[in-house]
């Protein structure tokens, strides 16, 4: 992939950009095999990759510069701002949005937050696009609600310029720390969730719910999990750390009992909406801590699917899964190091199948799906 920002030394986020994709995949596969070297693996499936540019459905832009000339991008470690509107990871559809946002910031008087001076209001612009209909969700992350009335007043102009903006919100993040969002979300549109669709499964994205940033590869990840589950004798499963329900909604069948657990209420609201649309009455989604839920249950499902954050599922949940002993565990991980550590804590299981998904091209990161079977 050619990137003018990288060539000019202005951005180094894509550390592997100079390597061809096949070389990147080989290096990632070697890393994964090294991490799982102590475990016999029955089947290594071929790695899955997607487009090498224009694949991201989300932009997280630090706002800097002045209210008249805002910059959207990032801050270097020394505080120097960098405009990343031309980043080739973004689809072409993002360019007109960034172009309209810059004059809008001036119109609404949204002074960019100055980290050094601890002054200003607009900290971040967060943009998400649906692959199914091109609709977009735009979030303004502000230090306070001081400029909220001005923003509301100026908003009709922006909506006229960009009718694709279906969901618009203000998030209040008052603390002087590099935290992307605060707890308070104020909706400026009637619509509160963005409609998405992977493999004919309706999914919903709300402002504070996690959603994969590479739809082309994520849809293949969910479809693969569905195929693996369909090959197993499973009538009852848990989907832990389920997010908006991507895995569970793909894997569920009308006669399957499925419980999805996620700590974020926003994500659970999305999952419930999708389940209702699909008419899947035996699906339950609850906003709880996954470990606390699992350890409080008396019943044992045949399959537990886990999709934890980078820290992994941790020893308490590993210990409980070992005791509870479901016949199958499917582990989806964005950090193979913590996954390998967790598998070490599950000695009663063997690795049946592993597949790497290149969710993050041009970086060392990847997603991996692993099927564990009780020994």
UniProtKB/Swiss-Prot annotation:
Residues annotated to bind S-adenosyl-L-methionine: 212, 241, 262, 307
GO molecular function: 4 iron, 4 sulfur cluster binding; iron ion binding; rRNA (uridine-C5-)-methyltransferase activity
Keyword vocabulary terms for this entry: 4Fe-4S, Iron, Iron-sulfur, Metal-binding, Methyltransferase, rRNA processing, S-adenosyl-L-methionine, Transferase
SUPFAM superfamilies per the UniProt record, alphabetical: S-adenosyl-L-methionine-dependent methyltransferases
CDD domains listed in its UniProt record: AdoMet_MTases (cd02440)
Binding annotation for [4Fe-4S] cluster: 3, 11, 14, 87
Name of the featured protein: 23S rRNA (uracil(747)-C(5))-methyltransferase RlmC
Annotated organism of origin: Escherichia coli O6:H1 (strain CFT073 / ATCC 700928 / UPEC)
Gene that encodes it: rlmC
